Amino acid sequence: AASDVYKRQNVKITVGNRTITATMEDNAAARDFLSRLPLEITLNDYNNMTEKIFYPDPALTTEGVTRGCAPTPGDITIYAPWGNVAIFCKSWSHSNALIKIGRIDGNGIEVLSIAGDIPVKIERR
C-alpha cells in the first residue's frame, strides 16, 4: 500500500561535524515535515534547555492528527497553538497541545542538549 512508504521514515540531522538520526511518525504532520526536507535551520533554545524549537513557514498541517503527548528526551513534536516544532531535550508534563511527529534515535538527543542556538541540517536518510 502507498501508506507503507511512510511507516518508518528516517531522517538525518547534522549538527556541526556530528550526525544523529530520527524516526518519523506515520501521520499527516510528519509527512508534511518530510516533504520540506532538506532543511537548514537554527534550533533556538527554549525554556532553559528543555526544548529546541523552530517555526516552519508555512506551519505544518495538523489536520486530523492525534493530539496529546507527554514528551521525553528525543521526542520531536509540534506545539499546535504556535505552530513551532519542539525537540525535547528534557521530559515535560503531558500536554494536549503537543503533536508527536518523530523521535531522535538512541541517545542522539545529547548532541542537541547544549545551551544556546544550534544550526542544523535535516534531510532524508
Question: What is each stretch, according to the model?
Answer:
Residues Q9-I53:
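N-terminal secretory signal peptides
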Residues T42-R125:
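Glycine-rich active-site loops that engage anionic ligands at enzyme catalytic sites
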Residues A1-Y6:
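Short, small-residue-biased leader/transition segments that mark boundaries at the very start
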